Structures are given as structure tokens and as C-alpha cells.
Amino acid sequence: LKYTQNFQSIKNNTEKPSAQEPFWNNLFLPGLDMVMLYTAIAELKPKRYVEIGSGNSTKVAHKAITEQGLKTEIISIDPMPRAEIDALANTIIRSPFEDSNFDFLEDLEENDILFVDNSHRVFPNSDATVFFLEVLPRLKKGVVVQIHDVYLPFDYPQFMCDRFYSEQYMLAAFLLANSEKYAPMIPNYYLSENKELSQIIEPIWNAIPHAVEKHGGSFWLKIEK
């Protein structure tokens, strides 16, 4: 709740935000995910913030870094060139994640953030498969990971089924097999669906002069060993 004023300054999609500004109701990053991403960066003060899949999240991250006076480096891994994102990132890797040299992710340190928002599909040599089998097990203790479009502990909702997303099943297997290493922090969808938990952050929505999406799909976890 301490960053409510910062959230109030975010424009709605009807207010003609600049190309580099985050905005509510953007169709890709729901309100709760924007709030939690900003808060995570402000609280953790990471040296590096790495995105596998960039866009609205990059704009939120840049806003948090700028307003909180941080020196966090933004590293964007995304195959789609976009001038507005390139202007916000310190390091730009414009190739599919599975074809990129991602060895540097092993050097991420405590409180660094790895924000994953990729194809969400576990297929042979897909970016999601490569992330879970070649990256996640090699991350150092203390690294914070966000995986987007995850609905755990629930299954994918009906309205998502025609997208054929499957990565949350891989995530669930990691959590069930080694909960001591992969510690859940904030499951946004569960938070938004639980009446008691959702009431805790209701003052944020009441302070924003727009109708904002209160749900989210970010699943935050921390590497504990």
C-alpha cells in the first residue's frame, strides 16, 4: 500500500499515454500484476532485472526504477524489435530465447529478478521448455522469479483453454518435487480470487480514479537453495 501514490499516477488506456509509459487496461498485463511488479522492484532493489518477453512489464519496471532512484539494469530478451522497449532497456537481446546465449542468467544474484512471459507452451525446444529444464535449475539462491499467465493452485480457466498453454504444469511439478528450493512468494491469481486476501489490497483500487483490472496472472517464487 505504500506505493499507492505511484499507482495513482499511471494513466488509463483512454488517456493517451506515451509509448514508454505503462497504462492500465492494456490487455496484456493486468492491474494486480502491474502493482506487484512495481512493488517487487521497489522493495527488492535488484541490481539486474531480466525479462524473457518484454512489453508493458518493461514500462512498469522502468517507472519503478526511475521513481525509486534505483540503478537496476534492465535486460530485455525478446525476438520482436520495438523502439519504445529498446529505449528503456540497458541491454537488448533480440532473438528467440531458446536460440540466445543465456549463460549470464547463472550470474544473477540475490534479489535480482527474472521476469518470464514467453510462449507459455511446453513443446520440444520451445522457450518455455528451455527455461524450465536449462535455466531454472541453475539459478542461484536468492534469485526471484516471476512466471506470467499462471493460475496455480487452480487449473487453467476455461477462457484460456483455446490458447493451449501448458507451462504451469511444468511449474507445478517443480514446486511439488522440491518445495524447499522453489518457494512460492505471491501467486497473484490466487490472491485475487481469495476474498480475504483480495480485501487487503482493495484500498489501492479505491485510490485509482479508473476501473482497473483487479486480477493477475503473475506467479512469484524465490530460489531458496
Segments (PLM) and residue ranges:
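A short alpha-helical cap/connector motif
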Residues: 1-67, 71-146, 150-225
